[in-house]
């Protein structure tokens, strides 16, 4: 990912799942660490506005959150937590109903806050909330890349399809990347992807790309108990090696060559009303 002056593109990846329990936050955290391990400057945005998870998963205690930035009480750099591997973390603005309910002044302040740090950043990983509510749609719609996490539960495929359908029909999104998580074999991961593509190919005009599989690994549970990322706590585990492989794929994804790739434009899209596309 090349530097391009003061307005270099930032790869924005929204990690989502359509339901809870698919391991989405674990994927976000460990993907961020694996990308940092490749030499990328990574920021992780905890976008679960109702239930902050990233800081809990890593045993971090935020003194301030994005809500303080939105309200003008501090700068974005004041809320950043330093995670493992040099990953910077923006704690969730818990209690904030939606990013679309901002005043024009808050809107402008948020765009400025992110533009101030974009020179020192290559990748922004966004850990979204579960479900298909306005908050999730806002973050996913604003990102350049959508990484959809699925697992071997019947509701996982159903909910992933519901999210794809909503984003496709209401917001014109046509490209999604899919990661199978907690799979008991590589074939199980491929089968999950096949199930999802079977329904999307039949009913929607979208393109799904299979990113890979993270195997079921007891090391992940042990790391969670330690409040550490598995990539850091057990670097030679099956899950960590899989995250490394996924990060190498992600690192090869093309950067947007137009202004859409600049961080300010991500925030601009984020604070647009999801139903109308107009800023509020």
Curated annotation (Swiss-Prot):
ATP binds at residues 19-26, 153, 181, 215-217, 221. Keywords: ATP-binding, Nucleotide-binding. ATP-binding allows dimerization and subsequent antagonistic effect against FleQ. The keyword Nucleotide-binding applies. The keyword Cytoplasm does not apply. Disruption phenotype: Deletion results in up-regulation of flagellar genes that code for structural and regulatory proteins, leading to the multi-flagellated phenotype, which shows motility defect. SUPFAM superfamilies: P-loop containing nucleoside triphosphate hydrolases. InterPro entries: FlhG (IPR033875), MinD_FleN (IPR025501), P-loop_NTPase (IPR027417), ParA/MinD_ATPase (IPR050625), YlxH/NBP35 (IPR033756). One of its GO terms (cellular component) is cytosol. ATPase that plays an important role in maintaining flagellar number in Pseudomonas aeruginosa. Exhibits anti-activator activity against FleQ, the global transcriptional regulator of flagellar genes. Forms homodimers. Interacts with FleQ. PANTHER family: CELLULOSE BIOSYNTHESIS PROTEIN BCSQ-RELATED, SEPTUM SITE-DETERMINING PROTEIN MIND HOMOLOG, CHLOROPLASTIC-RELATED. Belongs to the ParA family. This is Antiactivator FleN. It comes from Pseudomonas aeruginosa (strain ATCC 15692 / DSM 22644 / CIP 104116 / JCM 14847 / LMG 12228 / 1C / PRS 101 / PAO1). The gene is fleN.
């Amino acid at each position: 990912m090349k530097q391009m002056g003061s307005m270099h593109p930032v790869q924005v990846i929204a990690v989502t799942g359509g339901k809870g329990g698919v391991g989405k936050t674990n994927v976000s955290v460990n993907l961020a660490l694996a990308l940092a391990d490749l030499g990328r400057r990574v920021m992780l945005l905890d976008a679960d506005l109702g239930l902050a998870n990233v800081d809990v998963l890593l045993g971090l205690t935020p003194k301030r959150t994005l809500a303080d930035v939105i309200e003008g009480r501090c700068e974005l750099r004041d809320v950043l937590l330093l995670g493992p591997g040099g990953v910077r973390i923006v704690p969730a603005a818990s209690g904030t109903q939606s990013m679309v309910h901002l005043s024009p002044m808050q809107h402008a302040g948020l765009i400025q806050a992110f533009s101030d740090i974009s020179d020192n950043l290559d990748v922004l990983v966004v850990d979204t909330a579960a479900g298909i509510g306005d908050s999730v749609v806002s973050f996913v719609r604003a990102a350049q890349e959508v990484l959809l996490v699925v697992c071997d539960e019947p509701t996982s495929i159903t909910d992933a399809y519901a999210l794809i359908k909503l984003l496709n029909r209401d917001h014109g999104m046509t490209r999604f990347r899919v990661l199978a998580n907690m799979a008991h074999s590589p074939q199980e991961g491929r089968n999950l992807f096949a199930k999802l593509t079977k329904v999307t190919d039949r009913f929607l005009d979208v393109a799904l790309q299979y990113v890979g599989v993270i195997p079921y690994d007891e090391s992940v549970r042990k790391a969670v108990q330690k409040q550490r990322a598995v990539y850091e706590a057990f670097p030679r585990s099956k899950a960590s090696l899989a995250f490394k492989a996924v990060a190498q794929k992600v690192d090869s994804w093309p950067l947007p060559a137009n202004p859409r790739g600049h961080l300010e434009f991500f925030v601009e899209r984020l604070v647009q009303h999801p139903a109308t596309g107009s800023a509020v």
